[in-house]
Amino acid sequence: MNYQKLRILSYDSQFNLNEEYEKRFNSYSTIHTGISIFPFLNEQKVTSEKYELFYVPLPSMIEKAEKIKYNSEKLRKLSTSAKLPGIAQTKIFLSTMIDEIQSTNETEGIESTKYEIAEAIVNRETKNKSSKKRFEGIVNMYLNLNEMKFEYIKTKEDLKSIYVSLFDGESDIDEWPDGEFFRAGQVELKSNEKVVHRGVTSESEVNSAVTDLINFMNRKDLPFIEKCITAHYYLEYIHPFYDGNGRLGRFIMSSYLVRKLDPYSGLSISNAVNTNRAKYYKAFTEVSHPRNKGEMTHFILDLMDLIISGQEISLLQLEEAEGKIKHVLNYLDSLDDLTPAAINILFTLIQDNLFSMFTNMDDSDITAEKDISRYKLNPILKDLEEKGYIEKIKLKPSTHVITKKVIDEVAI
C-alpha cells in the first residue's frame, strides 16, 4: 500500500484522521523539526490550528537520498575529469549557472535574458565597476559558490545580508524591507487573483520565526538533504521579505547543496523547479493544508525528485561534453600541418566555440589561460589564420575564432 497524504486518506468516511496523524507523529522513527505552522485554506490562515512540521523517513526517502549522493559523486568525477579540459569545465559551469539564474527568474515571473546574465558575468570578471549591470548581485553570489565562498546563516543579520547581496539595486524588487531586518507589513501571494499564501504576520513574529528557522538550519542531528528541503519550505512559509523570497530561498538551497554535494547538484535546482513548476507549488500547498497537519514527508519526496531531475540533466550535459571533446581530439590528431603549440591554441579556440554561450575569448584571454606571452602567441595565431583554421573577428580587443571549416569538422 502506498504511503498516502493524510488529506487524501481523510476523504474515506471509514478513516480516522486524528488517529492516523497521532500514529505518524508519534512513531519511533518520525523526525520532529521543532518548527510550527498555521495551516492555510480558502485564502485564509487557520489560526485555530497549529502544527509542528514533521516527516517520516520512508524507505523511498532513504533511497532517493542515496540516489542524490550517488549522482553527486558521478557529477563531481565527470566535471573534474581529465577528459574535460579546464576551458570546457569553466564554460560548462558558466552555462549551467546562466540557466539556473534564468530559471529562478522565470519561476518568479521576472523577465530576463541569458544575454543580460552573461553581461553581468563579464562585468564581474573584468572588474568593471563603472558600469553596473542588471543581475550583478545574483551573478556574483552564484559565482562565489564555484569559488567555494559560502554564506553561513547564524543570525538574522546573515539572512538579511544575503538578501541585500542578491538584490541590491535590482529594479524588479518593488518594495524593500521596512523593518529592522525584514518586512514590517503583511504580505500575501496570489495566483489567478486568488490568495494562495499569507506570510507570517508581524515583524516581531517574522523575527521569531526566522530565529526558529536558523536554529533548525544549524542542527547537527538531521540528514542534510531532508534538513535543506524542510528549511526551504519554512523560509517560504515565513516570507520574510516583500519581494524576492522565492529566489532567495532557491539560492540558499543551491548554496547548501553545492557545499554538501557538488556545484552541479546545487546549480540545477531552479532549472528543475522551473520545468516542474506545478509540482513545486503543489508541494507547498499540500504541506499547508489543514488535513495534512504539518506533515513534510511528501514535500521532501517531491523536492528530492526535482533535485534528481536536475542532476540527471547535468549528467547528460557533461557526458555529451566528454563525447564532443573526444571527437575534437580525434580531429586534432588527424592534422599534420600544425605544430604542437598551434594545435594547443586551436584546441583552446574550439572549446571556446563549443561551450561558450555568448562571448568569445579574446587573444589576451588565451595568453592568460595558456600562460603564453603575446610575443609567442601572435605567430601561432598568424599561422592558424593563414592555414584557414581561424579568423580574426575583432581588432580591439584582438579576437580570433575558428572558421566554418573547423566548425563543420568538430560538429557532432
Residue ranges and their predicted role:
Residues 1-412:
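FIC/Doc superfamily catalytic core
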